[in-house]
Amino acid sequence: MNVLVVNAGSSSLKYQLLDTDTREVFAKGNCERIGSDMGIFGHSENGGAKQTEEVPFPDHRSAIARVLEELEKTDFTIDGIGHRIVQGGWHFDDSAVVDDEVMAKILEVAPLAPLHNYGEAAAIEYCREKYPELPNVAVFDTSFHMTMPEVAYTYALPKDVCDKYHVRKYGAHGTSHRYEWMMAKEILGSRCHRLLSCHLGNGASLAAIEDGVCRDTTMGLTPLDGLMMGTRCGSIDPATVCYLQREGGYSYQEVDDMMNKQSGLLAISGISNDARDIRTRASEGDERCLLAFDMFAYKAMQQAGSMIASMAGVDTIIFTAGIGENDWSIRKAFCDCFEWLGVRIDNNKNREAVGNGPQVISAAGSAVTVMVIPTDEEYMIAHDVERLTKNN
């Protein structure tokens, strides 16, 4: 089945057309700077070089329109369209074929992710209008985490407030965590029972997965909670917000921007939110970059402990996403903290596990299997399109 996967961000849109049977990618590209006077459109086919051009993208409708216009010039067919949706809220515990009711629910929960859901909804609506005969499937970052028990997702705030405003832990990166479980189970079989999935990138989260069911995750009501990230602070004392507004005179929006866009690795290193830049400077002795590296690993280790406790142990640890897949030193620092659990990694395998597909990096005799599995959210979304539409 040929599926067009659409991933609409707050000011960008990425797409990929792939075959769910062979995983062959026919075309892919991106639209950047949506909402500005002039955007950038990039497109490539069959693994060829990306061609770019400047195109005005006043909104997400204009961006997806340009994508479909480009694909219509090719001989590729589209059998279905899958859309990544950041927030499914309390409505969705699985992906869903889009109809008017599903669209209404996506917009109803949009206040929980206003920078994403509205743009994603606009892209879906355009696709439905353009190709009414094609199925559109919404795949939610949050749905995988809806299996968390009440004790894990409930916040210790007044119940009437939580009920009125739907305040609870929702998590994120669910499509990636679900893919990691699927791949680990395929490779390890019955040896994979309690899995710690470590999605470590510019955005980062952990998930405790027991027999395919999410027991807990580190992101919360929004993707700001949990681990220290590229530009996000992660978990801090909530009173910090009140303190900064009271003593510093910061507005709500200024604090929101600070914690989401000016914090994390960028704030501590003082130079970049890119782990590669920080690693280079740290190796040269830059003290702020060394601290940023150590804090990132420490925060991940610290919260991994709570994820492991929620499963009463761990059999498998998976690293994925930009940092998890490519930074052997972060993996080593993380795993060394769990030697007391019997985690042992093979240093040579760990160093070599960069961009080479799924690989086991744990040493012989390790009580826990440790792997690097490159994530593939696009395939997972396409897989859901096929799963939900093939019998219709």
State the predicted function of each range:
Residues 3, 12-57:
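Short glycine-rich, Thr/Ser-proximal phosphate-binding strand/loop in the N-terminal lobe
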Residues 8-9, 84-88, 200-202, 314, ...:
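Glycine-rich beta-strand-to-loop/alpha-helix junction loops that act as flexible
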Residues 71-116, 137, 143-152:
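Short beta-strand-loop/turn "lid" adjacent to the catalytic site in phosphate-handling enzymes
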Residues 83, 114-118, 135-140, 146, ...:
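General beta-strand structural signal in soluble alpha/beta enzymes
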Residues 144-245:
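Glycine-rich phosphate-binding loop of actin/hexokinase-like ATP-binding domains
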Residues 210, 216-251, 257, 321-353:
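Catalytic phosphate/nucleotide-handling subdomain of diverse soluble enzymes
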Residues 257, 264-268, 275-310:
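Adenine-nucleotide phosphate-binding core of ATP-dependent small-molecule kinases
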Residues 290, 294-315, 324-392:
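Internal helix-turn-beta structural module
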